[in-house]
Amino acid sequence: MKYKVEVLSNTIFATNSYLIIDNHNNALIVDPSFDPQAIEQKIDFLGLKVVGILITHSHQDHIFSVQYFMDLYRVDVWASEKSKELLGDRIRNLSFIGSEHFGLEETILDIPVKILEDETTYQIENFIFKAGIYPGHSIGCTIFDFGELMLTGDFIFKGTIGRIDWPGSNPEDMKNSLLLFKERYKEIDMPIFAGHNDATTIQKELKTNIFLLDPKNVKLL
């Protein structure tokens, strides 16, 4: 199946929210961020049926509109166990930054979540993807491998990786996650759509991203 990808970037932290669309106009929302109206307008314009919400990790700029779309479309939310833990933690989900520095309402969520396990394949309607859990930037960081495209959240970006100096970040976990990712995907290539910045590919990052070239010895901080 060929999936289509729509990216919507907000202006606060330049966070990318995504719509993954199948050939029947069903859609998954990935990391609904600070501009729910723009996302909703895109969904309406394209005539999409939302069938689920995926969370790569529970930092505020990736979960701000989860409750809004969960209530609007009456669909399940999918996240790792550790990401679920952070939904209601204003410090480790970084809501305190949004409220103290940008005047944003804090995002404190107590919602049912479908739990994702590492290296496990899931199906939502026609969507089939494998979840991979790679802590470091956040304890519950999850990538979504759709076979023909991948969403990495704030784990891996074009040319770099997610910050590891936030509350709940862990440099040693990040190093281990980079090693694991490199081993799992050393012979696989597909487009990567990250939580910030432009799209890239797995092999481009494995060959040029300094943090993936030699994860054992790279200086993270």
What does each of the following model-derived ranges do?
Residues 1-46, 143-153, 157:
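Conserved beta-strand hairpin/beta-sheet module of binuclear metal-dependent hydrolase folds
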Residues 8, 20, 118-125:
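Short acidic-hydrophobic surface loop/beta-edge motif
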Residues 8-10, 111-114, 133-135:
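Short Gly/Pro-enriched turn/cap motifs at secondary-structure boundaries
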Residues 28-30, 54, 77, 151, ...:
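Residue-level marker for buried hydrophobic side chains located in beta-strands
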Residues 35-121, 210-217:
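Active-site HxH/HxHxD metal-binding segment of metal-dependent hydrolases
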Residues 93-96, 128-220:
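Metallo-beta-lactamase
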